Amino acid sequence: YTFKVMKKIFIIVIATLFFISCNDSQKREQDKKIPVEQDNGIGDGAPSLSTAFAQGVEKTHNKEAFLAHNNISFDIALNFNGQERLKGTFTMRTNSSKIKFESKDGKTIIYNGEEVYLTPKEAEMESARFDILTWPYFMAMPFKLTDGGTIWSDVKQVTEKNRDYSKAKLTFEAGVGDTAEDWYQVYVDNNTNLLNYAAYIVTFGKSVTKAEQEPHAILYENYVVIDAIAISDTWKFYNWSEEKGLYGEPIGDATLSNIQFLESADYTVPKNAKKIEAPN
């Protein structure tokens, strides 16, 4: 009789432990943040497939290591339609909160996190505000895909010129930057998971309707790895359409050189600077 009772107790204990173990395992699985359906995800903090896609690209480029540095600087030589468009040195916080551009002809543009300034006061540079905000964004784009105010469409699989891509449209919440109505069509190489190219419109100083008549694209033609961080040092610009993708000959190009991370940088606005207002 004692043996039967002990046997029953033993079976009950084993069953209880098994039940607890199953529940604990199930809870751990539920606690994992896994991608779910496209519609913004469900559950406790689970990302959508689109967000997981953007996070995956940032991880491939090593966003965490990029943001671990305080500042980055690089020389840029930018050309459009066979003409020099911009040449000088950008210095910026890795989170883009402050940016400085020093041109080869002695002009300096500074974004101090709130306003844009040009020095010296008598300098004329019609594109100063556009330049200080646009080209640094293109450099840092692979690290900014999940910034506040970003909105992602569903991810699609496409093939262009025998190359397979994951593609999604990036838009922005109202009030983000100077031109929240800009959009990007982001193409990620399925073999490397690096950002290959991004089609875009520029609404700076123009309507969306006008901008959508001439979409362009930036092709990140080459990547260098600095401190385990993938940064593109060679850009090509093309015309683009939804039907054709990139087409025609390049309409512009840029070369980045002397790319380096800096512990400190000076973003002080000089006294002889003038403020550059945002477009209406």
For the regions a language model picked out, list residue spans one by one.
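N-terminal mature ectodomain segment of secretory-pathway/periplasmic proteins
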Residues: 38-39, 45, 51-124, 149, ...
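Short, Lys/Arg-enriched N-terminal segments with co-localized hydrophobic residues
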Residues: 1-5
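Gly/Pro-enriched, hydrophobic low-complexity segments
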Residues: 166-270
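Sec-dependent signal peptide recognition
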Residues: 7-13
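Bacterial signal peptide processing site
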Residues: 23-25
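Short, hydrophobic/aromatic-rich segments at coil-to-beta transitions
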Residues: 68-75, 94-100, 161-170, 196-197, ...
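C-terminal motif of bacterial Sec signal peptides marking the signal peptidase cleavage site
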Residues: 18-21
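Flexible, processing/modification-adjacent segments and terminal tails
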Residues: 46-50, 117-182, 208-211, 271, ...
